[in-house]
Regions:
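Electropositive, glycine- and tryptophan-enriched low-complexity nucleic-acid-binding patches
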Residues: 1-80
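Acidic, serine/proline-rich intrinsically disordered regulatory segments
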Residues: 16, 47-49, 55-56, 68-93, ...
Length: 215
């Protein structure tokens, strides 16, 4: 099922090697920092972070905002002897000089996953992509049955609906802690969750799929 109109949204999901799910970043189509969006976002679930971008992509501005709102607060909780490691793919906004500089200023090391390897060895992509999309798809189907088909709507769901779906999906996965931790138990990432390690890890991935993108 589908509507006759589509809108993009990027969902940036960030997990840590201890099984923590950090606030997600939702990037909707729209004017960056528009007054309407800011007012609207104030009514959304508070556990996530929201931005607008013309094409709903992660760009330099959104990436810097993510580092300020999500990455920096988490890094600040790390003990002094811990060196956080950020896993990123080769997406262009991850390579911009301003982004690289800010990551360095936060005292974070970066491990880049080579192009074409994200779906093979990126923890978020390998371990969370499918369960997250499954939960989003289920809520989409329920919406189509209850709103789309019954009322004959041809418009896509409201941004608030999507924000709630993401929130619900994250709560479900958070409640099933093994989903997040198991994402690290593949492709030699288990050393990150070794009790003796002196490094913590933050894993992210950016994927350009229409309708749902997982960072």
């Amino acid at each position: 099922m589908s509507t006759n109109d589509t809108k993009r949204v990027t969902v940036a999901v960030t997990i840590t090697a201890d099984g923590t799910l950090l606030p997600s970043t939702l990037v909707f189509e729209g004017k960056p920092d528009g007054c309407i969006a800011k007012k609207e976002f104030s009514t959304y679930p508070k556990t996530h972070f929201y931005k607008c971008q013309e094409a709903a992509w992660m760009d330099e501005e959104v990436m810097i905002a993510w580092m300020k709102e999500v990455l920096a607060p988490y890094v600040a909780t790390a003990p002094d002897h811990v060196v956080p490691i950020l896993i990123l793919d080769m997406y262009r906004c991850h390579m911009i000089s301003s982004v690289v500089q800010m990551i360095q200023e936060l005292g974070v090391k970066v491990q880049h996953i080579p192009g074409g390897c994200t779906s093979l060895c990126q923890p978020v992509d390998v371990g969370l992509n499918k369960p997250f999309k499954d939960r989003m798809r289920r809520q989409w189907m329920n919406w189509m049955i209850n709103e789309g088909v019954v009322h004959g709507t041809t418009s896509p769901p409201a941004r608030l609906d999507v924000a709630k779906w993401v929130h619900n999906a994250m709560l479900e996965m958070k409640g099933e802690g093994k989903i997040i931790r198991n994402a690290w138990k593949r492709y030699d990432y288990e050393w990150f969750i070794d009790n003796d390690t002196r490094e913590q890890d933050v894993g992210t991935n950016n994927n350009g799929a229409k309708g749902l993108q997982v960072m």
